[in-house]
Amino acid sequence: EVVYDDESMAGYMKAAVGVTPDRPILIDRFLNHAMECEADAISDGTHAFVPAVMEHIELAGVHSGDSACILPSVHISEENLETIKEYTRKIAEEMHVKGLMNMQYAIEDDKVYVLEANPRASRTVPLVSKVCNVRMVPLVTQIITSELTGKPSPVPELKEQAIPYYGVKEAAFPFNMFQEVDPVLGPEMRSTGEVLGLSKSYGEAFYKAQEG
């Protein structure tokens, strides 16, 4: 729930149910007009590799599953891209993640904020694997089974590659089937699927995703 003033906050608190010391209400400051982005990482517990950063088209506040995103990023500065990759690597290494990890960020006034660190596979893994030509799942399987197979971690050998086209992920919504669902997007996920548009043109990739 996003509230914008004291009156809305008071109304929400009155309507909240099941609030106990063990089930508190968590409050975060909302970043106004912030750009949201995310990054997936492959980590072996010591080293981490970030193939690319995905830029959300909708502003922060829309659930990442409902937001369209573009890969590689179009509007994020090189400095912020490097910051995001560095944060992702350091957090994965500090948490000793062995496998996949997804990080979500917001950028407000040219400052990068960490929103979430999820040490698990994300729905964006197929997108990143396809667009970046990185076989993320087989690589992670090799990491997880390394103690059984004796094979070394592939992470130190992974290098970021130039992406020759754009990939746009767009969410698929069930509003035509469930007409009672509020179509206004927010922090609660409403999509039931997604599609990918590919093109050497950002605009055409977005168009293909909309058509899909």
Listing of model-derived features with the role each one plays in the protein:
Residues 1-212:
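ATP-dependent carboxylate activation and anion-phosphoryl transfer catalytic cores
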